[in-house]
Amino acid sequence: MRVLASAPAKIILFGEHSVVYGKPAIAAAIDLRTYVKAEFNENGRIRIEAKDIRTPGLTVSFSEDQIYFETDYGKAAEVLSYVREAINLVMEEAEKQKGVTVSITSQIPVGAGLGSSAAVAVATIGAVSRLFGLELTPEEVAKLGHKVELLVQGASSGIDPTVSAIGGFLYYQKGSFESLPVVELPIVVGYTGSSGSTKELVAKVRKNYEEMPEIIDPILNSMGRLVEKAREVILAEYDKEIKFKRLGTLMNINHGLLDALGVSTKSLSDLVYASREAGALGAKITGAGGGGCMYALAPEKQSEVATAIKIAGGMPIVTKISREGLRIEDIVQ
């Protein structure tokens, strides 16, 4: 038996950093996917093949605590811990231990802040659980994905695996999630080609908050109110043009507030301003900042904005919101 599953990447639409201080955030799944094929093998080991994950690939197998590297190339190795923990958790759920081979291909750049780790964990859980005969709901997959992140990272809000498992728009605050109606946003993601350390950037904001609470607290409060306004706009019965304009304005304000927190970089700002000049209604950082990605809302201007991002030194990815989260693509008996 062979199962092929896929799970999407995500962007933080509004509310990164302020979410750490109990404010809400809105995230969305986007139409870039990681694909995981799972099948049983005869040697009793877990074997992982990652041949195309937007970095050079690797093949590795392990048994108990021993890892057998057949190739090892850079950041591709980061998928190992997420995949292994995902498989182990599914085996615990199924109360079975068998040799499994998983093959991974992905459209999601690793280390870009687009939730590549969560997507590979969710797709692995989806494929391997079906292989073992489990029928998990998207919510159950999301919970297992959150467990994987806790095991590997030590801390996780659960936003990334929840968005990847369920898809669409997700409103998050203090551990609770609410699905929002999907607005078909024509977006362009711009990748700087570098990534900042989320841990270091969060610590930087925390330091400024502790040293100057009277300055930083109003910024965080404004970001929280901005997310509530964005939720209002998403839920409102506006026509598409008005909705896009209002969301674009909120994106621009949110970027300015993130810049005030000190988490932007020149390369990110170059992509943001190039996008706006090319006709985007809004453009902002998505994720922790310090590198990674921005995104632009560009109705009828995606091609022009993508070109502007490329000229400004970024890697443009023209995409859209994914209504679907985890998807079982194929089952071969």
UniProtKB/Swiss-Prot annotation:
Catalytic residues as annotated in Swiss-Prot or TrEMBL: D160
E.C. code: 2.7.1.36
Reaction(s) catalysed (UniProt annotation): (R)-mevalonate + ATP = (R)-5-phosphomevalonate + ADP + H(+)
Keywords linked to the UniProt accession: ATP-binding, Cytoplasm, Isoprene biosynthesis, Kinase, Lipid biosynthesis, Lipid metabolism, Magnesium, Nucleotide-binding, Transferase
Cell compartments where the protein resides: Cytoplasm
UniProt record, GO biological process: isopentenyl diphosphate biosynthetic process, mevalonate pathway
Keyword presence, RNA-binding: no
Pathway linked to the protein: Isoprenoid biosynthesis; isopentenyl diphosphate biosynthesis via mevalonate pathway; isopentenyl diphosphate from (R)-mevalonate: step 1/3
GO CC entries: cytosol
GO MF term set: ATP binding; magnesium ion binding; mevalonate kinase activity
Entry cofactors: Mg(2+)
Top-level EC class: transferase
Binding site for ATP: P109, V110, G111, A112, G113, L114, G115, S116, S117, A118, A119
Pfam families: GHMP_kinases_C, GHMP_kinases_N
Superkingdom per UniProt: Archaea
The UniProt record lists the keyword Magnesium: yes
Assembly and interaction partners: Homodimer.
The protein's role, per its UniProt record: Catalyzes the phosphorylation of (R)-mevalonate (MVA) to (R)-mevalonate 5-phosphate (MVAP). Functions in the mevalonate (MVA) pathway leading to isopentenyl diphosphate (IPP), a key precursor for the biosynthesis of isoprenoid compounds such as archaeal membrane lipids.
Family of the protein in this entry: Belongs to the GHMP kinase family. Mevalonate kinase subfamily.
HAMAP family the UniProt entry points to: Mevalonate_kinase (MF_00217)
NCBIfam families: mevalon_kin (TIGR00549), PRK03926.1 (NF003036)
Name of the molecule in the record: Mevalonate kinase
Organism: Thermococcus sibiricus (strain DSM 12597 / MM 739)
